[in-house]
Amino acid sequence: MNLGKAGLTALAILMLASQGTSAPAAATVSGKVTLSGTAPKAKPLDLSKEPECVKMHAAEPLQPENVVVGPGNMLRNVVVYISGGLADETPVPPNAVMYDQQGCHYTTHVLAFRVGQEVKISNSDPFSHNIHPIAKINREWNKIQLPGTPPFSYAYDREEFIPVKCNIHSWMQGYFVVLRTSHFAVTGEDGRFMLPDLPPGRYTITAWHESYGTQTQEITITGTESQTLNFVFTAKP
């Protein structure tokens, strides 16, 4: 086949364009987080200061969520994230993350989101709440929300692990985990996490739990092959 000079030039341009649009190599790091030892025995929360809450949970008492384990002692509510090694990050998502006060508790106990990303806070209960994120690095604030009022939004400027409480209902507790990185996950009942789309490089991966602190591990990615990384926290005596 004789393409001629013009044909060869067009073919070269096409090949270069194809190379330029190919996706860079990326891998996935996944694993599980377990608790070694016996989890503390949970005592139902005392809701007696709010009779409506007592009625809501008459059939099934509301339990604390600071230490929750699933089958096989898999640990829930652990934030696993890239804490070192990433040079570039994706833009902050334009959509807000949702945080609701419903049934006398926070529907998401540990909510992780990006620095600069809005968190939209709702009150779905038929009574007032006063949400109070106790920030130390970012600005601390608290806001009362009457029943039936619209949600409000807030964004944080700096990375921080922020305890959240309700000034009206002392048993309502949670965490805002504000991260610079876009590579993070929060474990569910199965204790598993997945961090996809990691280009080749050396990374520090951190696992954080509100009761058991932090652990870090180093991992090197050389191509697109998936890797497994597990964390084990030790129960307190």
Residue positions per predicted region:
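Positively charged n-region of N-terminal signal peptides that target proteins for export
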Residues: 1-6
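Bacterial N-terminal signal peptides
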Residues: 7-18
